[in-house]
From Swiss-Prot:
Source organism per UniProt: Psychromonas ingrahamii (strain DSM 17664 / CCUG 51855 / 37)
Stretch list, region Adenylyl transferase: 448-946
Family according to the record: Belongs to the GlnE family.
GO biological process, one term: regulation of glutamine family amino acid metabolic process
Adenylyl removase as annotated region, ranges: 1-441
GO cellular component annotations of the record: cytosol
Alphabetized UniProt keyword annotations: ATP-binding, Magnesium, Multifunctional enzyme, Nucleotide-binding, Nucleotidyltransferase, Transferase
Annotated catalysed reactions: [glutamine synthetase]-O(4)-(5'-adenylyl)-L-tyrosine + phosphate = [glutamine synthetase]-L-tyrosine + ADP; [glutamine synthetase]-L-tyrosine + ATP = [glutamine synthetase]-O(4)-(5'-adenylyl)-L-tyrosine + diphosphate
Name of the protein: Bifunctional glutamine synthetase adenylyltransferase/adenylyl-removing enzyme
Enzyme Commission number(s): 2.7.7.89, 2.7.7.42
Encoding gene (name): glnE
Purpose: Involved in the regulation of glutamine synthetase GlnA, a key enzyme in the process to assimilate ammonia. When cellular nitrogen levels are high, the C-terminal adenylyl transferase (AT) inactivates GlnA by covalent transfer of an adenylyl group from ATP to specific tyrosine residue of GlnA, thus reducing its activity. Conversely, when nitrogen levels are low, the N-terminal adenylyl removase (AR) activates GlnA by removing the adenylyl group by phosphorolysis, increasing its activity.
Pfam families, per the entry: GlnD_UR_UTase, GlnE
Obligatory cofactor(s): Mg(2+)
Alphabetized InterPro entries for the sequence: GlnE, GlnE_rpt_dom, NT_sf, PII_UdlTrfase/GS_AdlTrfase
Length: 946
């Protein structure tokens, strides 16, 4: 126990330097020393605010079991004296600290049961939120008028408390998930300048978030997470009742039904609150018995398991097998299935729900009691973990001091006894979870004995070859396979693997060998799989995933057999193995218009303030979507143009998200630039060039982009740290590039190429639209005009989009000497071929050889530059080659035969390049391929350009 004593003495000395502790009674001194040893949070709170200890002891709060009335009246009294928001922020933070110290003190010293703690933590949060909301609502009514509906009825502000706050079971150090709403549209009354209710309540919501979430010298009250609102981060901060109802009826998803079970309305009593409480019941609780909820919960649990593996979480009492989340899923499965017919199940709290399940006979009482016991045990552990440092953690500690703190509070004399009890409780929970929600998937048959011996025994080369030959491989192939397998075994011996991992590997490999031997080139496939196995050998969770899911193992081998690139991707990022569990999803990429929504959903699980996790998650999302696209591509369920569409739309969704978070970071630091104050614009655009602009991205494509901002940006930002608007946009661009190019565990997001901006590498990072246009008109080379043909805005607002499109059309449509243009393009093409073509005699470079893809792209650009002065609107509309050729045919610039030959050749060459890329092969092929296509392109080129 010396570690606890040392910690207590250290904190006691620091506290004694701030306040005289000699007057403490012996019992008070004993309690203080105990709690200082157990909690850094309590110690640091008392050191920051020494008078707090005297206050608590004098008022006997530390010995009071029911403190709800004290919390309410004390907070009302403190807020009644508040005159401004700065003071409000301070009062809320100090009040929260004081009462959280009381909660921690009582629970850590065994004075309070878990139920008391959960009750008071949740009640404290309710009062802080409600009284903060009430003060700000009144203040804003004085400033902007009272919000009314069209009938002149005052409109109140309501909050959905979600998650554990909604269920009144908030944990000690927790985010609070909120959704804001108000009843009806209308305007404010009482001030000369009226504003609409949406604007009033949006501003109020922002002030409430600031009052609770913002970190000041006194800390914060709660981390506020608003991402569960309709349409997530891309949706408005607040919506009215009608819009909320419409959203959940039209767009509500299974996970939102699950989330809304615990949604509790906070706000003033009355008809509006009653209406709101009834509003979403039809969405959450179906009138029929809804067994589809089981599959939805199963998928959600699979996503959580995937996250645990992805983050490498170990000993996580919330998300791990048998953790708190599985208990919640058990209870909520019954609520979703039967809650529409059994109103008793429409309750918010987990403990209450479990008790109801026993009362109505849905689950035997002894099993409910087992779940309740486990829940109380796990939540008690969670509270202690969080009371140590007021940190949101559910992972068991790995340092001896915190381990000792945990077992001391939990009543154990050693770690092993505690850990055994914890595992026993979690095993019980997982068994119950499997009974209610577990997957019915049958385990695969074990591979036959011979293959088990091949893997487990040290057979000679001759014996292994003979065994494989008997399994159907020809003798030469069997010998090569035996050699490759022996090499794999030798490599695995060099890698650390525990007993559990070794046992799993020994079960997995015979089955894997059996499946590999069915393929035409099992040696090559084994070599591809070897790289993955070496990467995951020390990560037992992934070995278990493949061993326990035969379907996932089969999908893995199929994809790796078809594509070296996919095999390498899986080896570099084994987190993607989780995506193999659902073949229906795997071969069905996200719909083009849904990438933004899917990205928002994926990012919901990541704390907004944790930029490192945000960057990592963005890369994981991209890799997952790449896998879906590649799988569908390999399966030929989508064709080449669709592959490029998917890759391009994905890049645009990621670009949109990155710009948004970069913008929020900049605004948080410097405020809004003056040119957009009072609007929802950013005055900023990203222009995609090259393959991104032409909607022709491949798997390894860079993003060629140019950044633009508004023309008139004189002035500065309106934040506490004001900077010039020009500097704001420059730093915004730098931030965007950093978010894309920073290397995390999952690599970079995309390579960003800025060389096509005005003046190239020597040019400024962000240009105004006017200076961009001026440069292109007066200083740009012909090749820059060619590049402009494939340019389009990929992030923008309407105003800046219109200006960019006008600039692009003006430049592309300017009159040119077509003969001189043809000469320039021809000369440029010859230079490129000389420096970039890789083919040798008897070979063909799909990209650079005569008749190759670049010839076709240059020809499309020539057609636009040569003829846009006569038909600019039509020719400047598209940035992709195929639609440019189609437009030229409609305008009479190409014959139907010429259009077909060009598009046919371009698609064939791109498809071939694409297939080679999937297997990480060079674009150089034998010279006897695509002869007719090449001749067609050369003939058309010569007709127009020679």
């Amino acid at each position: 126990m010396s570690l606890l004593n040392d910690a207590a003495l250290h904190h006691f000395e620091n506290l004694n330097n701030r306040i005289d502790l000699n007057s403490l009674k012996l019992s008070q001194h004993t309690e203080l020393m105990k709690v200082l040893g157990l909690s850094d949070f309590v110690a640091e709170s008392l050191i920051k605010q020494p008078a707090l200890l005297t206050d608590l002891l004098d008022n006997e709060l530390l010995s009071l079991a029911d403190r709800k009335e004290v919390i309410t009246t004390e907070l009302e009294s403190a807020i009644a004296k508040v005159k401004d928001e700065v003071t409000l922020h301070r009062v809320l933070r100090l009040f929260r600290r004081k009462h959280m110290v009381v909660i921690a003190w009582r629970e850590l010293l065994g004075k309070a049961h878990l139920v008391e703690s959960l009750d008071h933590i949740s009640y404290l949060a309710d009062q802080l939120i409600l009284q903060c909301m009430s003060w700000l609502y009144k203040k804003q009514c004085v400033e902007q008028g009272i919000p009314m509906n069209n009938e002149g009825v005052r409109q109140p502000f309501f909050i959905f408390a979600m998650g554990k706050l909604g269920g009144k079971e908030l944990n000690f150090s927790s985010d609070i998930d909120l959704i804001f709403t108000y009843p009806e549209r209308g305007e404010t009354q009482g001030e000369r300048r009226r504003i609409d209710n949406q604007s009033f309540f949006t501003k109020l919501g922002q002030r409430i978030i600031g009052a609770l979430h913002q970190t000041t010298v006194d800390g914060f009250v709660y981390r506020v997470d608003m991402r569960l609102r309709p349409f997530g981060e891309s949706g408005p901060l607040i919506t009215n009742f009608a819009s909320i109802e419409d959203y959940y009826q039209s767009h509500g998803r299974d996970w939102e039904r699950y989330a809304m079970i615990k949604a509790r309305v906070m706000g003033e009593e009355g008809d509006y609150k009653t209406t709101l409480e009834a509003l979403l019941k039809p969405f959450v609780y179906r009138r029929y018995i809804d067994f589809s909820a089981i599959e939805s919960l199963r998928k959600m649990k699979a996503m959580i398991s995937s996250e645990v593996r992805r983050k490498g979480l170990k000993d996580n009492i919330k998300l791990g097998k048998g953790g708190i989340r599985e208990i919640e899923f058990v209870a909520q499965a019954f609520q979703l299935i039967r809650g529409g017919r059994r109103a008793e199940l429409q309750c918010k709290g987990l403990r209450e729900t479990l008790k109801v399940l026993a009362e109505i006979g849905e689950v035997p009482k002894e099993r409910v009691q087992s779940l309740l016991d486990a829940y109380h045990f796990l939540r008690a552990v969670e509270n202690v973990l969080q009371q140590i440092g007021d940190k949101q953690t559910q992972t068991l500690p790995d340092n001896e001091l915190d381990k000792l703190r945990l077992i001391t509070v939990m009543g154990y004399s050693n770690w092993q006894d505690f850990y055994s009890k914890l595992n026993q409780e979690m095993d019980n929970v997982h068994a119950e979870f499997n009974w209610v929600i577990g997957d019915d998937e049958e385990a695969h048959d074990e591979a036959d004995q011979a293959l088990s011996e091949l893997w487990a025994l040290h057979l000679s080369q001759q014996e292994a070859t003979h065994l494989l030959h008997e399994k159907g491989l020809d003798e030469s192939l069997a010998a090569h396979f035996a050699t490759a397998l022996s090499a794999l075994k030798e490599e695995l011996k060099k890698r650390p693997i525990g007993p559990r991992g070794q046992a799993t590997l020994d079960k997995l490999m015979p089955r894997m060998i059996e499946l590999i031997c069915v393929y035409p080139d099992p040696v090559e496939l084994l070599n591809r799989i070897t790289q993955l196995l070496l990467k995951i050998i020390s990560r037992t969770a992934y070995l278990e995933l493949l061993n326990e899911n035969d379907g996932a193992l089969k999908q893995l081998l199929k994809l790796c057999n078809e594509s070296t690139r996919v095999a390498s991707q899986l080896a570099r990022h084994p987190i993607l193995l989780d995506e193999l569990l659902d073949p229906q999803q795997l071969y069905k990429p996200t719909q083009l218009d849904n990438y933004r929504t899917e990205l928002q959903l994926f990012m919901l699980r990541i704390p907004e303030e944790d930029m490192e996790q945000q960057m990592e998650a963005l890369r994981q999302f991209k890799q997952i979507q790449f896998l879906y696209i590649a799988a569908a591509d390999i399966e030929k369920s989508i064709q080449l143009p669709q592959v490029s569409d998917h890759l391009t739309y994905l890049s645009e969704a990621i670009m949109d998200y990155v710009v948004q978070i970069a913008w929020l970071q900049m605004v948080d630091k410097f405020g809004l630039p003056s040119n957009v104050i009072g609007s929802d614009r950013k005055g900023f655009a990203v222009i995609g060039y090259g393959k991104m602009g032409g909607i022709e991205l491949g798997y390894g494509s860079d993003l060629d982009v140019v950044f633009l901002h508004d023309d008139n940006i004189k002035g500065e930002t309106n934040g506490r740290r004001k900077i010039d608007n020009q500097l704001f946009y420059f730093r915004l661009a730098q931030r965007i590039i950093h978010l894309f190019s920073a290397r995390t565990n999952s690599g970079i997001l995309y390579e960003i190429d800025m060389r096509l901006r005005p003046s190239g590498d020597s040019g400024i990072l962000v240009s105004s639209v006017a200076s961009y246009k001026k440069y292109l008109q007066n200083n740009a080379w012909t090749w820059e005009h060619q590049a402009l043909v494939r340019a389009r805005a990929v992030f923008f607002d309407k105003l800046i989009l219109a200006k960019f499109n006008e600039a692009r059309e003006t430049v592309l449509s300017q009159a040119r000497n077509n003969s001189a243009l043809a000469t320039e393009i021809r000369d440029m093409r010859a230079k490129m071929r000389k420096h970039l073509s890789r083919e040798k005699e008897g070979q063909f470079d799909l990209k650079q050889s005569p008749g190759g893809m670049v010839d076709i792209e240059f020809f499309a650009q020539y057609l636009v530059l040569a003829h846009a002065c006569h038909c600019g609107e039509e020719l400047c509309k598209w940035s992709d080659n195929l639609r440019i050729f189609e437009t030229c045919r409609k305008l009479g610039l190409l014959t139907l035969d010429e259009e077909k030959k060009l598009t046919g050749a371009y698609c064939a060459l791109r498809d071939a390049t694409h297939r080679l890329t999937l297997n990480k092969k060079t674009r150089i092929i034998k010279g006897d391929q695509f002869i007719q296509e090449r001749q067609n392109v050369i003939k058309i080129w010569e007709k127009f350009l020679d």
